[in-house]
Each structure stands twice: as structure tokens, then as C-alpha cells.
């Protein structure tokens, strides 16, 4: 969503040596580990259209991957996203599902989604993914355009009706725009896959820029790659407006930028007293407190309210409608403290949350990650405090430190405000 005029001027830029990108064969989608499967319940957390969920089930996916958990909730809201994650972690599904979710196919003869990549093979593969996930959306039209084929064929395709989704390589897409065959004036989603491959090569980068300038200002921009060097990140961000940045180094590591993580050793019966003390001394915008059961969620939210900490609870015992209603109240800042079971740990995002408490230790390192990721959303500051009350809690905390290569230290007597509050 960046202003087109703010793009870097690459004409004066010193051309760095770039090696020609080989037409690598894109990884096959049936390789184990690709998309780390999707359980329909996991994807239901993202509140996707029933037609999309049905296609997901048909594909046999079970659990959303780390990348999907982090990106999809923001992507479906139209947020700009810059994401780096290794191949086979389900990056493609992020933008395919997010754009299909936002698509309103009643707008015929209008291209709403443009996805570009650097090779013909990858373009073809992405178009096939769109076809798979839009299986139960019969009005959605997808087309793929790339070099090496007669351009007249592409022009005929466009003449018979503009597709809602266009996938292709920059050279061919630009040729179709220059020939006035492809109109992107109403485009809503601009996606680059393997973005560094396109933006590192000066000629391809200029093509991408020219295409970008032919699209509206208020569109969503998403960029994905397996490798994003520190040098190329600012170039990507020139196309974007306050993007959510997600960097997954490998399947085990998700870097949480700006998040301070601490633990407190205490007995089970000391948890409430410690929690109230910390809520008194810490400065927070909004807080999420995670507990392990519905009963504890109900009891703690009531206790907090009695102690003049107005809280709202969300747990798996509620109907979907009630959960969403309470989630919206919290999101609208009607309450500043939320008590939740793991149900809330995945796929929901509140930008004002800057402190997360693990009142009860999560059952595994994955759950820990999804819980603490609610605070300090990528690039913002946040604080995660975990209560450790027995040997099993300590064991899980050690697993978290080993798996994610982080050092979680004991909570100090005083915490510098600037480490967990923006602008301090």
C-alpha cells in the first residue's frame, strides 16, 4: 500500500552484480512436510469461507504451519506482509487463501489479484494452487501468463474476459499492460513470490516497478521468499505500508523481534498474588493471560474483576458467536485484560497487546510460541512472563529455550519500560 511515488529510483543506483536465476523446478506439493497439513478445525480459527475450508479438507491438509498461523489472520484483513520462510512451509497457501477469502467474484471482468514470480514453472504451480483452493468457487477465474509462449494466446484469453486472478512473470505481464490488454486499475492485491529473485535483478526490478505504478494506491502488498537478505528487505518495504514482518529461519525457529521473555518461580497458590502485583507495577496497553482450563478461565477473570482489574474471558466452552463477540470487545479496547485458554493462542491478533502471561505453563513449545506471539507482534515491543510452579513446567521451559534458541531469564525486580513499551 505504499505510495507509488515513494519507490526508490533505481536509475541512479549502482548496479550490483547479480547472477542469473536458474529456472529451478518448484518443489512438488505432495512432498511430506509441505504445508505441514491443515486440520479443518485449525483452519476454522481463521474464519475462512466454507467453500475454501471444503477445498482444504479435500486436499487432506491437517494443521496450519507456523507461517500460516502467523500470516493468515493478518493477510485476510488486508494487511501488507513481508515473509521469509524456507520452501515447503506453506507460504503459497498464505497468499492463495488470503486473496481468495477477500475476493468478491461478482465483479466480473476485473483483475483483483496479481501474483508474480521469477520463473514460468513457479507461475504455473501457483496458478494450480489457486485452482485447487477455489475448487468450490466456480465463478472465480484464474489465468497464468509467462514468456516462451505466443503473446497472442494470452491476449485472446484476456479478450474473452478478464480473470479475477492473474499469475505470471514480470516480463510478460508488463508486455500485456503496455499493449493495453491487461488493466490493473482496480487491482486489490499485489503479490510477489520469491520476491528477492525479482528485486535483486535490476532489469526485472524495473519491470516490477513499472507494473506496480500501473496499480491503485490502496492495494494490499504481500511479498514472500525463502531468502531475504538484510539488504533486500528495505527494497521490499518501499512497496509497502507498515508491513507485518515474519522471518522463519527454519521449521523450529520463529524470530520474535522485540519480545522480552522472563519466568517467575513460584508455588501454585502464589500465582494470584504475584499476578496482581505485576499488573499493579507494569505498564500495559492490553494484556492476555493464558490458563489451561475453562474453569480456571472463568474463575480468574471473575477474580481479576473483583480486584479492580476489569477482565473478559474467552474459552472453548463458549459458542463461536460468543467468542467472536468477546474477541471484538477486547479488540475495540472495551476491556484491557483478557483471560483465555489455548483456543485464543492461535490465529487471533490484537495489535495493542504488549504483555502476555503464561499463568499456566503451556503443554509444549509450539503452544508457548503461539501464545507469546500475541505480544510484541513482529517489529513491536512486548513482554512475555511465564509462571513456573513445578518440575514439569521447568522441563517445558527448557524445551522452549533449546528449540527456539532463546534465553528466558528470571524476571528482574525492575523492568525498563523502554524494553516493552513503544516510544519509551
Curated annotation (Swiss-Prot):
GO biological process, one term: mRNA splicing, via spliceosome
Domain annotation Helicase ATP-binding: ranges: 72-246
CDD domains: DEADc_DDX39, SF2_C_DEAD
E.C. designation(s): 3.6.4.13
Keyword Calcium in record: no
First-listed, main subcellular location of the protein, grouped into a coarse class: nucleus
Domain Helicase C-terminal positions: 258-419
Region (Disordered): 1-27
Catalytic activity: ATP + H2O = ADP + phosphate + H(+)
Residue numbers binding ATP: 85-92
An annotated GO cellular component: spliceosomal complex
Chain positions of motif DECD box: 193-196
Superkingdom of this protein's organism: Eukaryota
Pfam families, per the entry: DEAD (PF00270), Helicase_C (PF00271)
PROSITE patterns: HELICASE_ATP_BIND_1, HELICASE_CTER, Q_MOTIF
Subunit annotation: Component of the spliceosome. Interacts with the exon junction complex.
Similarity annotation: Belongs to the DEAD box helicase family. DECD subfamily.
Protein name, per record: ATP-dependent RNA helicase WM6
Naturally occurring in which organism (per UniProt): Drosophila melanogaster (Fruit fly)
Lineage of source species: Eukaryota, Metazoa, Ecdysozoa, Arthropoda, Hexapoda
Gene: Hel25E
Amino acid at each position: 500500500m505504499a505510495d507509488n511515488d515513494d519507490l526508490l529510483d533505481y536509475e541512479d543506483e549502482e548496479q550490483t552484480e547479480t547472477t542469473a536465476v536458474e529456472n529451478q523446478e518448484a518443489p512438488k506439493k505432495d512432498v511430506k512436510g509441505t504445508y505441514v497439513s491443515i486440520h479443518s478445525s485449525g483452519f476454522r480459527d481463521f474464519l475462512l469461507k466454507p467453500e475454501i475450508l471444503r477445498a482444504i479438507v479435500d486436499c487432506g491438509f491437517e494443521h496450519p504451519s507456523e507461517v500460516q498461523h502467523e500470516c493468515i489472520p493478518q493477510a485476510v484483513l488486508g494487511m501488507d506482509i513481508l515473509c521469509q520462510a524456507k520452501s515447503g512451509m506453506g507460504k503459497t497457501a498464505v497468499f492463495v487463501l488470503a486473496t481468495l477469502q477477500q475476493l468478491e467474484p461478482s465483479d466480473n471482468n476485473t483483475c483483483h489479484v496479481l501474483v508474480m514470480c521469477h520463473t514460468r514453472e513457479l507461475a504455473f504451480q501457483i496458478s494450480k494452487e489457486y485452482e485447487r483452493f477455489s475448487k468450490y468457487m466456480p465463478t472465480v477465474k484464474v489465468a497464468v501468463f509467462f514468456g516462451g509462449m505466443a503473446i497472442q494466446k494470452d491476449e485472446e484469453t484476456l479478450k474473452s474476459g478478464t480473470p479475477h486472478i492473474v499469475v505470471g512473470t514480470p516480463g510478460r505481464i508488463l508486455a500485456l499492460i503496455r499493449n493495453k490488454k491487461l488493466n490493473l486499475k482496480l487491482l486489490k492485491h499485489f503479490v510477489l513470490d520469491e520476491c528477492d529473485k525479482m528485486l535483486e535483478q535490476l532489469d526485472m526490478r524495473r519491470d516490477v516497478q513499472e507494473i506496480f505504478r500501473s496499480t491503485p494506491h490502496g492495494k494490499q502488498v504481500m511479498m514472500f521468499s525463502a531468502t531475504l537478505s538484510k539488504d533486500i528487505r528495505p527494497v521490499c518495504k518501499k512497496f509497502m505500508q507498515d508491513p507485518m514482518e515474519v522471518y522463519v529461519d527454519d521449521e523450529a525457529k520463529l524470530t520474535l523481534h522485540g519480545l522480552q521473555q522472563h519466568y517467575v518461580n513460584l508455588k501454585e497458590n502464589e500465582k494470584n498474588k504475584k499476578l496482581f502485583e505485576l499488573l499493579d507495577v507494569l505498564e500495559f496497553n492490553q494484556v492476555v493471560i493464558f490458563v489451561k482450563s475453562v474453569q480456571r478461565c472463568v474463575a480468574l477473570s471473575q477474580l481479576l474483576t473483583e480486584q479492580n482489574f476489569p477482565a473478559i474471558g474467552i474459552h472453548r466452552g463458549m459458542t463461536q458467536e460468543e467468542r467472536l463477540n468477546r474477541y471484538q470487545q477486547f479488540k475495540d479496547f472495551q476491556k484491557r485484560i483478557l483471560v483465555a485458554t489455548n483456543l485464543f493462542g492461535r490465529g487471533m491478533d490484537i495489535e495493542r497487546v504488549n504483555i502476555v502471561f503464561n499463568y499456566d505453563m503451556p503443554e509444549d513449545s509450539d503452544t508457548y510460541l503461539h501464545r507469546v506471539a500475541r505480544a510484541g507482534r513482529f517489529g513491536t515491543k512486548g513482554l512475555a512472563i511465564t509462571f513456573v510452579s513445578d518440575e514439569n513446567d521447568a522441563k517445558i521451559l527448557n524445551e522452549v529455550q533449546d528449540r527456539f534458541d532463546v534465553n528466558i531469564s528470571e524476571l528482574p525486580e525492575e523492568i525498563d519500560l523502554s524494553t516493552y513499551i513503544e516510544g519509551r
